[in-house]
Amino acid sequence: MSVVSSVTVKVPGTTANLGPGFDCIGAALTIYNQFQFTRLETSELIIQATGAEAERVPTDESNLLYQAFVKLYQYIDQTPPGVKVEIELGVPLARGLGSSATAIVGGLVAANRLAGEPLSQAQVMELAIAIEGHPDNVVPALVGGCRLAATGAMGWEICDVPWHGDIVPVLAIPDFELSTSEARRVLPTEYSRADAIFNTAHLGLLLRGLQTGKGEWLRAALQDKLHQPYRQALIPGYDAVNTAAVAAGAYGMVISGAGPTLLALADVSHAAAVAAAMSTAWREAGIKAVVRSLALDTHGAT
């Protein structure tokens, strides 16, 4: 078997939760990080990063991308080679768009390819979930599409969620950060039965709305009582941006992942107006934001 000397992995950013699907549903988006690993003759580690906020990327063994790379080699009981790692950043850091998931998936996939692909995609997925701690970002980052994950008797069960072609994800990405740990600290440790039932019903409605593109279902579905009511206060201007998005024709707006990025779903005919309205609302609130209309990535890590 020939030894591969260099691999390049392109991994999509993701949006998780989609309102009522807290910690169990996520979708891959057409925004990417790219990672190139080149095998070295020595045990040296070289990490170089370019793109937005590249100066913040660790260039030593604490780098999450490299840690995932090493984790796979440990799993297959091999010593990781020295590598030069070149990172091209397209997914904003700490904005609720799965930047850490791109690193985990990128490191695992690159290691698997350099090692001759000893692990199946399902095994790589299990490792990714174990590292991240939850499936909603790493699963769509690896396999693409919109995915629902649940634990079964034999491990994780992953379900493809059909996404109607007329549904456009519109992202408003502010110039401030919100860490996942901070966003989790504000959540209660217990919920009422009524709130659990509310989210169960709305997640079911969301799945059907995404499949059919039916506006009435989507407008009702994008509600949540488990995480968003507690996190909204951490995002200045949330109410104004939400009001503007809905007034411009969005089905609704949710927090992308742990935030602070806000995600609106709209049909093709309203997407541009929704994007403009969200941008204006945040600007009037004194916050700079980049607003992008994206699409569902259906390939995952390539």
Curated annotation (Swiss-Prot):
Q: Which domain of life is it from?
A: Bacteria
Listed binding positions for ATP are: 92-102
Q: Quick one: which pathway?
A: Amino-acid biosynthesis; L-threonine biosynthesis; L-threonine from L-aspartate: step 4/5
User: Which Gene Ontology cellular component terms are annotated?
Assistant: cytoplasm
What Gene3D superfamilies is this protein classified in? 3.30.230.10, GHMP kinase, C-terminal domain
Question: A single Gene Ontology molecular function, please?
Answer: homoserine kinase activity
Query: Which reaction(s) does its UniProt entry say it catalyses?
Result: L-homoserine + ATP = O-phospho-L-homoserine + ADP + H(+)
What broad class of enzyme is this?
transferase
- BP terms from Gene Ontology: threonine biosynthetic process
* Localisation: Cytoplasm
Keyword Chloroplast (UniProt): no
Q: What is its EC number?
A: 2.7.1.39
Show the Pfam families listed in the entry: GHMP_kinases_C (PF08544), GHMP_kinases_N (PF00288)
Enumerate the UniProt keywords alphabetically: Amino-acid biosynthesis, ATP-binding, Cytoplasm, Kinase, Nucleotide-binding, Threonine biosynthesis, Transferase
Span of the secretion signal?
none
Matches recorded under NCBIfam families: PRK01212.1-4, thrB
UniProt family annotation: Belongs to the GHMP kinase family. Homoserine kinase subfamily.
Functional note = Catalyzes the ATP-dependent phosphorylation of L-homoserine to L-homoserine phosphate.
Xref: HAMAP family = Homoser_kinase (MF_00384)
Q: What is this protein called?
A: Homoserine kinase
Organism annotation: Trichormus variabilis (strain ATCC 29413 / PCC 7937) (Anabaena variabilis)
Query: Which gene holds the coding sequence for this protein?
Result: thrB
